[in-house]
Amino acid sequence: SGAAAAQTAAASSLHQASNHTFYPWMAIAGESTADPSKSKIRSDLTQYGGISTDMGKRYSESLAGSLLPDWLGTNGLRRRGRQTYTR
């Protein structure tokens, strides 16, 4: 199920980050278990009830329910054509 976990992590990182998704770089901080519900970080997240209310309010105000989080800039994950950043 390693391929399935990698597939769900890749799919979920494209979309909105929710509490039950497992990201591969989380394994550095906590003990790396295959089940994300057993990890220490996940239990710390559920202790605070997931997304706090003011964060949800900021989310809906800034992007109106879009899937991109509001800490991304306008060109956060967008690719530019053949225009280079440094010349």
UniProtKB/Swiss-Prot annotation:
Q: In which tissues is it expressed?
A: In the embryo, expression is seen in the epidermis, somatic and visceral mesoderm, and the peripheral and central nervous system.
Which cell locations does it reside in? Nucleus
Single annotated GO MF:
DNA binding
Keywords on record: Activator, Developmental protein, DNA-binding, Homeobox, Nucleus, Repressor, Transcription, Transcription regulation
Specify the domain of life of the species encoding this protein.
Eukaryota
From the record, give the cysteines joined by S-S bonds: none
Q: Which InterPro entries match?
A: Homeobox_Antennapedia_CS
| Span(s) of short sequence motif Antp-type hexapeptide | 22-27
Similarity-based family = Belongs to the Antp homeobox family.
What does this gene product do? Sequence-specific transcription factor which is part of a developmental regulatory system that provides cells with specific positional identities on the anterior-posterior axis. Binds the consensus region 5'-TTAAT[GT][GA]-3'. This homeotic protein controls development of the cells in the posterior thoracic and first abdominal segments. It activates the synthesis of the decapentaplegic (DPP) growth factor.
Protein name per Swiss-Prot or TrEMBL: Homeotic protein ultrabithorax
